[in-house]
């Protein structure tokens, strides 16, 4: 069971990193020029499509960090025995790292954007939680777009969802304690 838990954490790390990156890079002044909303301010039914919090800065940085994370994982698997024990049945040596890293990032942030669309349509203010959708959006998005390259068993997906849900809750609370987020959930 421990091996399965470690695999789920290792395998999905690029998506988890993509999901948290926009929050971490928000205060960086060098990326402010990318601080434009990806919905271009458009509305649907008199409500913003995604809102001002979904920016090009977050999308670009999240996708870049997911790709970098997967590349570092691939290097680690090639160099270190401890990393090879985390890979399960996934052959990291033959993964299309750049493509899959981009998909992890786009899937995670795309899932988050889709969930934001529904939050806006339900009048949930930006920054306010919408449990459990806020915690599952990136997991579902990244899982769906990576299936053509790495298909896991239903048990592995279930474990992945539960573990990363818990990781997300802990990270959100930590972000709130560190004043990176306005609300704990």
Q: Across the structure, where does each feature detected by a protein language model lie?
A:
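Transmembrane helix-loop junctions at the membrane interface of multipass transporters and ion channels
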Residues: 146-150
């Amino acid at each position: 069971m421990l091996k399965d838990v470690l695999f789920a954490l290792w395998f999905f790390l690029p998506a988890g990193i993509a999901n948290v990156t926009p929050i971490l890079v928000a205060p960086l002044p060098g990326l402010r020029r990318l601080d434009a909303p990806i919905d271009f301010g458009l509305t649907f039914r008199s409500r913003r499509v995604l809102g001002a919090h979904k920016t090009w800065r977050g999308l670009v940085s999240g996708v870049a960090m997911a790709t970098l994370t997967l590349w570092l994982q691939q290097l680690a698997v090639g160099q270190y025995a401890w990393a090879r024990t985390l890979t399960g049945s996934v052959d990291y040596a033959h993964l299309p790292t750049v493509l899959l890293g981009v998909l992890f990032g786009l899937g995670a942030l795309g899932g988050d954007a889709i969930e934001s669309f529904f939050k806006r349509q339900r009048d949930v203010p930006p920054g306010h939680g919408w449990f459990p959708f806020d915690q599952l959006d990136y997991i579902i998005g990244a899982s769906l777009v990576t299936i053509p390259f790495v298909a896991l068993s239903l048990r592995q997906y279930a474990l992945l969802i539960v573990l990363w849900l818990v990781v997300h809750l802990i990270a959100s609370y930590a972000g709130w304690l560190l004043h990176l987020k306005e609300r704990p959930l």
